[in-house]
């Protein structure tokens, strides 16, 4: 134990359990709800896990395409726990797509989802979103 008091940046329980965050843009367009866990930019173990995932998915280069893929993989496997995506109201055959990290990478790589990926990654790295007062009642789910 250190002789110094250093406050915790996040509630460990909230950071691991995740928080549900809705995404509605400035124009009022709803992009769904996303359950995010805290992605700590200072956690060395998490940084190593990112590198392992990038290597596994073959995106270790510094090409722009690989940067996008690395961001999508990091968020899909380490930050995103679940989602409730909107369905196309004009398509009667539209189905709910359950969350999987593989589908999340595909979704987050879509050129039309760049803003979603960016907004979700920003929130997943924002420690103010993962404080003790943000605990949700998981017994309802």
Report residues per predicted region.
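Residues that cap or initiate secondary-structure elements
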Residues: 9-10, 27, 42
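Generic, ordered loop/turn and secondary-structure boundary motif
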Residues: 5, 24, 84-86
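A structural detector for beta-sheet-dominated domains
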Residues: 7, 22-24, 37-39
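Short, surface-exposed, charged amphipathic helix/loop patches that serve as local interaction elements
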Residues: 30-141
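Short, intrinsically disordered N-terminal pre-domain segments
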Residues: 1-15
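Short acidic-hydrophobic surface loop/beta-edge motif
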Residues: 16-29
């Amino acid at each position: 134990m250190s002789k110094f008091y250093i406050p915790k940046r996040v509630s460990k329980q909230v950071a691991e359990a995740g928080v549900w965050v809705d995404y509605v843009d400035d124009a009022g367009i709803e992009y769904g709800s996303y359950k995010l866990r805290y992605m700590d930019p200072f956690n060395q173990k998490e940084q190593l896990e990112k590198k392992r995932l990038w290597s596994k998915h073959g995106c270790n280069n510094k090409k722009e395409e690989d940067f996008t893929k690395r961001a999508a993989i990091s968020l899909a496997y380490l930050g995103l726990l679940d989602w409730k995506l909107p369905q196309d109201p004009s398509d009667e055959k539209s189905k709910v797509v359950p969350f999987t990290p593989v589908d999340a990478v595909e979704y987050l790589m879509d050129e039309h989802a760049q803003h979603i990926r960016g907004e979700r990654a920003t929130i997943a790295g924002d420690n103010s979103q993962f404080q003790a007062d943000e605990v949700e009642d998981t017994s309802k789910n």
